[in-house]
From Swiss-Prot:
PANTHER family: S-ADENOSYL-L-METHIONINE-DEPENDENT METHYLTRANSFERASES SUPERFAMILY PROTEIN (PTHR31760:SF0). This is Ribosomal RNA small subunit methyltransferase G. It is found in: Cytoplasm. Belongs to the methyltransferase superfamily. RNA methyltransferase RsmG family. GO terms for molecular function: rRNA (guanine-N7-)-methyltransferase activity. Its main location: cytoplasm. The gene is rsmG. S-adenosyl-L-methionine binds at G62, A113, E114, K130. SUPFAM superfamilies: S-adenosyl-L-methionine-dependent methyltransferases. The keyword Glycoprotein does not apply. Keywords: Cytoplasm, Methyltransferase, rRNA processing, S-adenosyl-L-methionine, Transferase.
């Protein structure tokens, strides 16, 4: 079997397990919807993106059912992926998926993002999260995890520019990161507009970030002057 066929087979099996798992891991209930909104949305923005392709170890915070981390792990077996979620039922599901799919390049952690940062500070080449939190909150979680001159990605829809961008701008200096590039793309027959916003870590993250468990969401950094 060709490598590409093997990956496609694993993706099909993964979608089947994801939408049929007894604990709700996704809002999508059909293979078509799951493929477009979860698989394609994870792959399209990074398939030609050097900041991702040149990275060796990658972290996905709030991975849920494995989006995008597990999808990326299937397509990039030469890279290491660390998937983090604070909900034990989701991590248990991922253990099953990884075993069934015979994936060997994934490490699972059942931890809060704030605690995970204590043991994996300045460790990763690339960090991401999807649908976890507003951009300023997500950036506080992710910035401490990557090395200086490494990258952070956020998946966003069109509402990012009207609802979230102002909060993003307010945390860049505080976290020693800079916006690096925006990748815009479309998914599905209805051509839904999607964006991957990439940030570069330009200096050491101050030691007080991330703040203690629960504080980033309760008192978002983007709202603090």
């Amino acid at each position: 079997m060709k490598e590409s066929d093997e990956k496609a087979e694993k993706i099909n099996k993964y979608i089947e397990m994801l939408i049929n798992y007894p604990v709700n891991l996704t809002a999508y209930t059909t293979k078509k919807d799951a493929y477009e909104n979860l698989i394609l949305d994870s792959l399209i923005p990074i398939e030609a993106e050097d900041t991702f392709l040149n990275s060796k170890n990658i972290v996905d915070i709030g991975t849920g059912g494995g989006i995008p981390g597990l999808v990326w792990a299937i397509y990039f077996p030469e890279k290491e992926f660390y998937l983090v979620d604070s909900v034990s039922k989701k991590i248990e599901a991922l253990k099953i998926f990884i075993k069934e799919l015979k994936i060997t390049n994934v490490y699972l952690f059942c931890e809060r993002a704030e605690d995970f940062a204590k043991t994996h500070r300045d460790y990763f080449d690339f960090a991401t999260c999807k649908a976890l939190a507003r951009s300023d909150i997500a950036l506080e979680y992710l910035s401490p995890l990557v090395k200086v001159n490494s990258y952070i990605s956020l998946f966003k829809g069109p509402s990012y520019y009207t609802n979230e961008m102002k909060y993003t701008q307010n945390v860049l200096k505080k976290l020693n990161i800079a916006e690096f590039k925006e990748i815009d793309y479309e998914i599905g027959e209805d051509k839904k507009k999607r964006y991957m916003i990439l940030f570069k870590k330009i200096g050491i993250t101050p030691q007080n970030f991330p703040r203690q468990v629960g504080i980033p969401k309760k008192f978002p950094l983007g709202e603090i002057k």
